[in-house]
Amino acid sequence: MINPIVKTIELPDGRTITLETGKLAKQADGSVMLRMGNTMLLATVCAAKDAVPGTDFMPLQVEYKEKFAAFGRFPGGFTKREGRASDYEILTCRLVDRALRPLFPDNYHAEVYVNIILFSADGVDMPDALAGLAASAALAVSDIPFNGPISEVRVARIDGQFVINPTFDQLEKADMDLMVAATYDNIMMVEGEMHEVSEAELLEAMKVAHEAIKVHCKAQMELTEEVGKTVKREYNHEVNDEELRKAVREACYDKAYAVAASGNNNKHERFDAFDAIREEFKAQFSEEELEEKAPLIDRYYHDVEKEAMRRSILDEGKRLDGRKTTEIRPIWCEVGPLPGPHGSAIFTRGETQSLTSVTLGTKLDEKIIDNVLEHGKERFLLHYNFPPFSTGEAKAQRGVGRREIGHGHLAWRALKGQIPADYPYVVRVVSEILESNGSSSMATVCAGTLALMDAGVKIKKPVSGIAMGLIKNPGEEKYAVLSDILGDEDHLGDMDFKVTGTRDGITATQMDIKVDGLSYEILERALNQAKEGRMHILDKITETIAEPRADLKDHAPRIETMTIPKEFIGAVIGPGGKIIQGMQEETGAVITIEETDGMGRIEVSGTNKKCIDDAMRMIKAIVAVPEVGEVYKGKVRSIMPYGAFIEFLPGKDGLLHISEIDWKRLETVEEAGIKEGDEIEVKLIDIDPKTGKFKLSRKVLMPRPEKK
């Protein structure tokens, strides 16, 4: 007998979310079916009983999958089944992973797999905002150790009002789109985009989201009680040697502190100095002893190194590379280093460097999006590549990973609002990270701004980005907010808070917090400190190039657009595409046409102005409305005993009656020297109101002979 347990959560606007367990996927360690309207997500979690030998990290894998059947659709492709994860699914995985990962115990190293599957969708409610809640609820009803629960909500600002988990339609009207994950007590993760909002407005949105999350967390706690999973499984994944831990600290801490406070701004030299301390300590042991003790020494020394770095910052205000907490690394920029792309730039900040290129394309280059719930075309693309050599690693480069997709998406969100909505070009920005020591996604934003301006893209305002960090020990009042963090400060610190924006406000943000008890006061300080840093970086950008170039590069495509009444779309295309293809062959231009907002939108692109002008002239002739009294240059299509048929506009023929050819009487058309294929000037003298036929005259354009 199945006896499911159901919990209902009510949103501020009266909509409800239900969490049901005990009915589906009962062999998983935990499973929950979440439902909101007709959107249904099944989240399952399974954990291995034992840790993977030699593992000193949290082997968590989060998968999010949308089934096409959920929305009554067939998958595309030859096989007609779901394939590899889309970018949207990967980004949703990352949102959930980043919220869950910090809350597993530090000494828990068993493999944990979280699977979230969209089984039903209505196209109204957005499933990505529900995935975090579903995953946390599955953990809540399991016996897997987890310091949750958490929940994740989307908060949008629409007409000045904050809305929790807006619908697809509502989100289109929002000027702020923020995903927030939190426990009952603390915010853990934030990511979103916005239309140049202030720091205070961003904080307000976080607070609104957190209040909604508290309700979700309370429901999960009640669910845990009802299921009877308040006591989690016992585990022992770490073997410790307290004497060895003490010995490592006594022998290494002062030396590690000296390196941390030395102010060496060379990452590899610092790494070698820290590594030498550990190897010196290991040298006292035999090879046989090290087989057992080396993993423990590595773990204990990592803790020592972390503490030394943190204490140097908290006690002396000295960072690893010698900077003050608010100081930005040296910046140099260059625009136009590459002659081939339509725009390019180098942005270097300390040991982080991005070489970014911009390519301009036509409508044919748009990216087609065909996910389960997301359809359309994207005209602004940003790709981020992170090769191993950027950190000096000797390893093969594989395909694009989740991290690269996530970092590229953040930079895309930061910049996309500055591309004018009516900009005719499809724009692709590609950031190649050539060096990395922290904040490479923010370097991408800065290099992207420079490259777009170098390409002559008429961006509204330049955008810069900065990554902020935090050092805060539990139970200590003292803390330090760090501007422009290094990779080690990200790894050994408590927060990674990325903020991008123009001079007038924030355009995108991403925050991951690894510590409990982070107050809004600290967040406010971090945001204000980030603003100072952003303004400094913007100054460096505008010193290099103050505004977009007036003209495109010579080898960039040229585009002209025009709109026509939709009833002329067929005339421009022609039967089987004959007319439009003929124009393209004749002129060398690329012509695209689509119906938008009840009008035909035509885009003509080419490598030179002449081919575009020729194509535009031909299109204008096709869509021109014949006017009585206008003079046209037409081609003789056929000759009849009673006159000639003239094509005076593309696709429009009129009769030039024999009596209208000349003032003198003609027996045949040929007497006037007219033959098929000739081009002659004619005047439209009448349009038959019943048949719509056109009557032309040639003689009215000729001098009338005087009467004898």
Swiss-Prot record:
GO terms for molecular function: 3'-5'-RNA exonuclease activity; magnesium ion binding; polyribonucleotide nucleotidyltransferase activity; RNA binding. Residues 557-619 form the KH domain. Residues 629-699 form the S1 motif domain. InterPro entries: ExoRNase_PH_dom1, ExoRNase_PH_dom2, ExoRNase_PH_dom2_sf, KH_dom, KH_dom_type_1, KH_dom_type_1_sf, NA-bd_OB-fold, PNPase. One of its GO terms (cellular component) is cytosol. Keywords: Cytoplasm, Magnesium, Metal-binding, Nucleotidyltransferase, RNA-binding, Transferase. Its EC number is 2.7.7.8. Its cofactor is Mg(2+). Its main location: cytoplasm. Gene3D superfamilies: GHMP Kinase, N-terminal domain, K Homology domain, type 1, Nucleic acid-binding proteins. The keyword Disulfide bond does not apply. One of its GO terms (biological process) is RNA catabolic process. NCBIfam families: polynuc_phos, PRK11824.1. This is Polyribonucleotide nucleotidyltransferase. It comes from Bacteroides thetaiotaomicron (strain ATCC 29148 / DSM 2079 / JCM 5827 / CCUG 10774 / NCTC 10582 / VPI-5482 / E50). The gene is pnp.
